[in-house]
Design a protein with these regions (language model features):
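N-terminal auxiliary segments of SAM/dcSAM-dependent transferases
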Residues: 1-31
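S-adenosyl-L-methionine
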Residues: 120-150
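A short glycine-rich, Lys/Arg-flanked "PGG" loop and its adjoining helix->strand segment in the class I
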Residues: 177-194
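Conserved beta-strand signature within the Rossmann-like core of class I S-adenosyl-L-methionine
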Residues: 193-201
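C-terminal lobe and adjacent flexible extensions of AdoMet/dcAdoMet transferase-like proteins
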Residues: 258-369
Length: 369
């Protein structure tokens, strides 16, 4: 899939990476449904987008695996990948379980309306199985996601929408309501009572805000959010049209991606994406980290004499401030927080519209799962 390239081949690949990047960002409305049929775009995806997308799905599987209820500890794991594309999410699942102590039999069902995507997904799974003793099978179904509710009903332990929800009903003014209704229908039909649904979307403001709106609709429909949210209230980020919520994971990219970054002026030194993990039961990340915790939902806001973040928890989204003069060994980790961290506090001052850290405040950053 990835081989040593000459300088000219690398330049050609970089040009295709730029072309694909534009289609996935600024020119999203021009993105053809079957864009991976284009050989150049397909090679750009495999070289530049597939590796980080593996890391994203594995990060979310770790969040599920961290739960004391051992949510992924099954002898057989049935996985439904909706809009599977070339099989990236399935490869991420295979790599995750092949590296772990618990190695279930994995039964994949992959749904995509592009035959070439299903073929690539099959080749990817077959290639992985040839180098691993992990027991896995794959069933492919050619169908759009919109037609998926008509598939034979089977209870799946894991349902995945990876970078696909934003591509359906894209030009429809009622896209949020239609996406919400479709996801809710699919979860009601296909998600096991103790199963999980992972939804990954780009970190762009438009796609991330759309996902937050779908999140609110799913909560209203009775689906609890396992992660990243630490509360089930309406998402406060939607109150301001300039706000959105996304994850940002540190990442050391492989050499090829570093070379492509130099040629394209793009950056893959961290992994930005929006996501939801949805379940039917009431299990959440608070079972892992405790009830009174917050999620960091901004970059550090540094100004003269202080550092601030936005954090989100049971009371919604608020600014939290620590003045430099109040730094102590008990709260010094505050200055090293990153977007996405889960954090707890002792002796935190609640000023109503914001929180304040004093010399007496203890800051406890939870280990990233």
């Amino acid at each position: 899939m990835i081989h040593a390239r000459s300088h000219d081949e690398l330049k050609a690949l970089a040009a295709d990476v730029i072309r694909l990047s534009r289609l996935l960002t600024r020119e999203r409305e021009s993105l053809p449904a079957a864009y991976l049929k284009d050989r150049g775009l397909r090679e750009a995806y495999e070289a530049y987008y597939l590796p980080p997308n593996l890391v994203k799905i594995q990060a979310l599987l770790r969040e599920l695996a961290a739960h004391p209820g051992k949510l992924l500890d099954k002898d057989t794991l049935r996985v439904l990948d909706l809009g599977c594309g070339p099989g990236t999410a399935m490869l991420g699942v295979l790599e995750f379980f092949s590296a772990g102590k618990k190695r279930p039999r994995i039964e994949f069902t992959a749904v995509d309306h592009i035959a070439e995507n299903l073929k690539m997904a099959g080749e990817l799974v077959t290639k992985f199985k040839s180098t691993s003793d992990l027991d896995a099978s794959l069933k492919t179904i050619r169908s759009t996601i919109e037609q998926a509710p008509h598939l034979p009903e089977t209870a799946f332990d894991l349902i995945i929408f990876s970078n696909v929800l934003n591509e359906i009903f894209i030009h429809d003014e009622a896209r949020i309501a239609k996406r919400t209704a479709l996801v809710a229908d699919l979860l009601n039909r296909f998600l096991a009572d103790d199963g999980s649904c992972i939804i990954i979307e780009p970190a762009l403001r438009e796609t991330a805000r759309d996902l937050l709106a779908v999140r609110n609709g799913l909560v209203d429909a009775g689906f609890p959010i396992y992660a990243p949210c630490l509360c089930h209230a309406a998402c406060p980020a939607l109150a301001n049209p300039k706000d959105w919520c996304h994850e940002d994971i540190p990442w050391d990219p492989p050499e090829l991606i570093q070379e492509l970054d130099k040629l394209t002026k793009l950056r893959k030194d961290s992994l930005k994406f929006s996501y939801l993990i949805v379940r039917k039961d009431a299990k959440t990340l608070r079972d892992v980290h405790g009830e009174h915790v917050f999620r960091v939902v901004s970059e550090p806001l540094v100004s003269k004499g202080k550092i601030e973040f936005y954090i989100c928890g049971e009371a919604g989204r608020k600014l939290i401030t620590r003045q430099d003069k109040d730094e102590t060994p008990g709260n010094d980790v505050f200055g090293r927080l990153r977007r996405g961290d889960v954090v707890g506090f002792e002796n935190l001052i609640d000023e109503g519209r914001r929180y304040k850290i004093s010399k007496e405040t203890q800051v406890n950053r939870r280990t990233r799962t």
